[in-house]
A protein has these predicted regions:
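Short, small-residue-biased leader/transition segments that mark boundaries at the very start
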Residues: 1-6
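Conserved active-site and cofactor/substrate-binding residues in soluble primary-metabolism enzymes
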Residues: 27-38, 59-63, 67, 96, ...
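Rossmann-like adenosine-cofactor binding region
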Residues: 156-245, 250
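Adenosine-phosphate binding glycine-rich loop
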Residues: 112-113, 216-325
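General beta-strand structural signal in soluble alpha/beta enzymes
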Residues: 51-55, 78-84, 150-153, 201-202, ...
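Glycine/serine-rich phosphate-binding loop and adjoining beta1-alpha1 elements at the start
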Residues: 7-120
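Glycine-rich phosphate/diphosphate-binding loop of Rossmann-like nucleotide-binding domains
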Residues: 87, 93-194
Length: 325
């Protein structure tokens, strides 16, 4: 998927996914460190600054990236900050990387709202997931004047039709994004997706919007902050209902885009300010949104299909120039 998605933004990356089957919430910090270093030793021959470049995702953070960079540098016998992204600033990380996924989603929401003549201020928003992306996203939108009427984590969901106090929730959440277990009155994830709202953002895990609940969604805009949260059948249903669905390959690309920026900065040995990073990110995402939305309107197809058409076309063009086809 990433191989086809990244050409949408003209990023010279391929793509791949990997992970470890574990629950870091049940592990000590020392166990997480040993596991992180062991993972790097296992994949070290396949990764590197000029091979595959790992980046953070679910249940990872800058500390884990730092351990991994340190382990790879020990194996490589050379300080290799460009081996991995999402690092702390002091180890060659990029300004803005920690909130880049959320900022990318905000940019996608702004562009989608503009197409639907919707104001962010006062809009009712539901966010599934309150981890790194979900919590930063909630804070961004809250500060823009949106009403966050529902959020969820792994243990349940919270709802307030008048808008939740996001600053209070952020102050109470733990390092894994858990907050609902502190409240007696919660709702289920099923009920979360049925809430009356203008914008729905699945920012947790895959396959959350299916043909079983797609008809219950009341939002007019759905923006995918998670990877693959909507099934193909649900995508068809939402599109037929006139709901604007902004696909994950576009909406959740803020993180990987700034990971690319981090890699570029590591290679150059020259680092940008957070304002520069955010400006470059906005430029990339707004251009990609315009291209995808225009194609979807011209061909009367959903934005996911339009995004894949663009990504696959650019990938195929590169392959032809290299003599692969």
């Amino acid at each position: 998927v990433q191989t086809c998605a990244l050409p949408i933004f003209n990023l010279p990356y391929g793509g791949g996914k990997g992970g470890i089957v574990c629950d870091p919430r049940q592990m000590s910090i020392h166990e997480v460190e040993r596991l992180s270093r062991g993972y790097v030793r296992a994949i070290s021959q396949f990764v590197g600054p000029n091979k595959d470049i790992p980046a953070p995702d679910v249940f990872t953070n800058s500390q884990i990236m730092a351990w991994m960079m340190d382990e790879y540098s020990a194996l490589d016998k050379f300080n290799s900050p460009g081996f991995i992204t999402g690092k702390p600033i002091v180890l060659g990380g990029s300004h803005g990387r920690d909130r880049s996924t959320a900022l990318g989603v905000v940019i996608a929401i702004e562009q989608a709202a503009k197409r639907r003549n919707m104001q962010i201020e006062g809009a009712k928003v539901v966010i599934q997931g309150f981890g790194n992306a979900g919590s930063f996203l909630a804070k961004f939108l809250y500060d823009l004047g949106a009403k966050i009427v529902g959020i969820s984590d792994a243990y349940g969901a919270l709802h307030d039709p008048n808008g939740l106090d996001i600053d209070y929730l952020l102050d109470r959440r733990d390092s894994f994004g858990t907050v609902t277990n502190l409240f007696e009155e919660t709702i289920s994830n099923k009920e979360l997706f049925e809430l009356d709202c203008d914008i729905l953002v699945p920012a947790a895990i895959s396959n959350q919007i299916t043909e079983d609940n797609a008809h219950d969604i009341k939002a007019s805009i759905v923006v995918e902050a998670a990877n693959g949260p909507t099934t193909p059948e649900a995508t068809r249903i939402l599109t037929e209902r006139g709901i604007l669905l902004v696909p994950d390959v576009l909406a959740s690309a803020g993180g990987v885009t700034v990971s690319y920026f981090e890699w570029v900065q590591n290679n150059q040995g020259y680092y940008w300010s957070e304002e520069e990073v955010n400006e470059k990110l906005r430029e990339k995402l707004e251009a990609a949104f315009d291209t995808i939305y225009e194609l979807s309107q011209n061909r009367k197809i959903d934005m996911r299909l339009a995004a894949y058409i663009i990504g696959i076309k650019r990938t195929a063009e590169a392959a032809r120039y290299r003599g692969w086809a």
